[in-house]
Amino acid sequence: MRPDELIPDRDDAPPVAEIAWLLERGYLDAIEGELKSGKEATVFLGRTRVGLAAVKVFRDLAVRSFKNDGRYRAGRYIGDARIEKAIARRSATGRRAQALLWAAHEYAMLWRLKAAGVSVPDPLVGPDVSDIAQAGEVVLMRFIGDETGPAPRLSDLRLAPDDARRAFDDAVRALAAMWRAGVVHADYSTYNLLWWQDSVVVIDLPQAVEADHREARELLARDVASLCTTFGHHGVDAPPEEVLRLVTSG
């Protein structure tokens, strides 16, 4: 079957060239349908030799929906002033370049956090940067869930008190492990945490920043506040100041 026959006929479908490369290299066997469509990306269900996969596609038209994306990109090396200008102008070239940068950065963060022992979806391309570049704006990672469906986000669940506390403690440990690894998620809440087999899985990392980023501490404090607020809906009462001290004390 040709690569274009595996791809849905829609504006935000995975790009044919990148999917062809993933097929030829044996990373991907098939795309079966859409899992989720958001402002920044669409996620499709794929099949690989090692099982189900999430095929996340950053769309150039959607890059504009990242609020203050320059804030997160600060300090990231691009090396081409023309590309920087195109991104700043939001031209077609700039939007495409930005989609590629978000995808490459998410791959880098997935590999880094996996090595640090943080529960994230296993990246299925890389860590070689040339392979990641070939994948373009497509992030291929292990699917969290099973044949019956994807793992739910914590924001979509109503947990029993004991489960809610266990999930919160797990999420705080993950946040602390990221900080020790030199990473701040920068969009951390129950909306970006999956609950699978009684464990938290951290997702959505394109906006993650280095711990030496000029606004890292502010972004970390915001992450902690968001985590405490969204877990408040599950009945967990945790003072953000205490949680922040716990996260940064290790």
Annotate each language-model stretch with its function.
Residues 126-127, 191, 244:
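Residue-level "edge-of-site" marker
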Residues 149-160:
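AlphaC helix of the protein kinase catalytic domain
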Residues 160-167, 179-185, 196-250:
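C-lobe/activation-segment region of protein kinase-like
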Residues 1-7:
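Intrinsically disordered, low-complexity regulatory segments that flank or precede the catalytic domain
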Residues 187, 191-193:
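Catalytic-loop signature of eukaryotic-like protein kinases
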Residues 8, 15-150, 176, 180-181:
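Conserved ATP-binding subdomain of kinase catalytic cores across diverse folds
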